[in-house]
């Protein structure tokens, strides 16, 4: 993940100069994932095994001239023979949050479960009853707040950048997205780009090797900011990965 060896985000001018939003600009590289390294990454079209993610550094260039413009490119890794030592970068960006810090991935597989709002009502009621009982036990034992596990924060969907799994719908109502091209089956989560790797409510997902206070304070290693410190979920069609993707910011 990251923009390559381009140095820290501070080298980019976040002020829009005269005509900056109208002149052609190179898109920013956000992530590069190989299926051999990320087992849960959904398959690409036509035997593609390399997913490259780019976005435009200006909100105004998204759909209907608003929001984010995302570009996903599937490639066959064995066909990539010429690699740019110095990828092109824009002279200006609309927001510093569009410029990732260079990062090396260390994928780790975890078990995830659907967002609570998509579960059957009876199961949701059982989960709520269990959490209420745990809360009462914690209060009687004078345990500090959030020291008991909850489905939303500890057991279902982890924070941070992810490939595959289930999407969080913490900002909007839970939804099942259908492919705009075929509507053959519910779309599946391809990738989550998160502003933070953890927060105060999801500390149980923090890697053990990063729980030292000096390290734990840095929950934003990529420097990416999606919306108001939210996350971007990108969905793919399970019937045909070549169909258009959908996205949701939470």
What is each PLM-predicted segment?
Residues 1-250:
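Preference for intrinsically disordered or flexible, low-complexity segments
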């Amino acid at each position: 993940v990251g923009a390559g060896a381009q140095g820290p985000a501070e080298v980019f001018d976040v002020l829009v100069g005269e005509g900056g939003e109208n002149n052609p600009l190179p898109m920013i590289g956000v992530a590069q994932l190989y299926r051999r390294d990320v087992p849960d990454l959904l398959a690409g079209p036509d035997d593609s095994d390399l997913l490259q993610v780019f976005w435009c550094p200006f909100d105004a260039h998204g759909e209907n001239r608003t929001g984010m413009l995302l570009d996903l490119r599937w490639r066959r890794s064995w066909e990539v023979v010429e690699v740019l030592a110095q990828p092109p970068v824009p002279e200006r960006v609309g927001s510093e949050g569009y410029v990732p810090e260079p990062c090396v991935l260390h994928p780790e597989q975890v078990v995830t479960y659907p967002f609570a709002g998509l579960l059957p009502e009876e199961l949701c009621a059982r989960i709520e009853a269990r959490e209420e009982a745990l809360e009462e036990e914690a209060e009687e034992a004078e345990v500090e707040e959030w020291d008991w596990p909850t489905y939303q924060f500890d057991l279902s969907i982890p924070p941070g950048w992810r490939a595959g799994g289930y999407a969080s719908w913490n900002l909007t109502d839970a939804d099942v997205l259908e492919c705009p091209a075929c509507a053959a089956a519910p779309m599946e989560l391809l990738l989550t780009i998160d502003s933070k790797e953890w927060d105060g409510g999801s500390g149980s997902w923090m890697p053990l090797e990063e729980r030292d206070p000096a390290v734990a304070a840095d929950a934003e290693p990529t420097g990416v900011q999606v919306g108001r410190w939210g996350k971007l979920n990108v969905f793919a069609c399970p019937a045909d990965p070549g169909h258009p993707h959908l996205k949701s910011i939470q």
